[in-house]
Design a protein with these regions (language model features):
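A detector for short, charged/polar N-terminal pre-domain segments
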Residues: 1-6
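Short basic helix-loop element that most often maps to the first helix and adjoining turn
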Residues: 9-28, 53
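Short, basic-rich loop-to-helix N-cap that marks the start of a DNA-contacting helix
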Residues: 43-53
């Protein structure tokens, strides 16, 4: 499994733990829902700045998002 796909799966996992829809998270971090879908499915990259915003919104560390073990 690629690291990009694992990152996306981690975002999706923690988003669901917070009971946030893709639309809700995308709005908070100023993404389109389509871009968030692509990030969560490993089809697109996002910036480090956006990863920090996602982590802050989900109340986790960036390390948790990029933990690939």
């Amino acid at each position: 499994m690629s690291r990009l796909l694992k990152l996306g799966q981690n975002i999706k996992h923690y988003r669901k733990l917070k009971n946030l829809s893709q639309n809700e998270l995308a709005e908070i971090v100023n993404f389109s829902r389509e871009h968030l879908t692509c990030v969560e499915t490993g089809k697109e990259y996002t910036s480090l700045r956006k990863l920090f915003l996602i982590a802050d919104t989900l109340e986790i560390s960036v390390k948790q998002l990029v933990d690939f073990d």
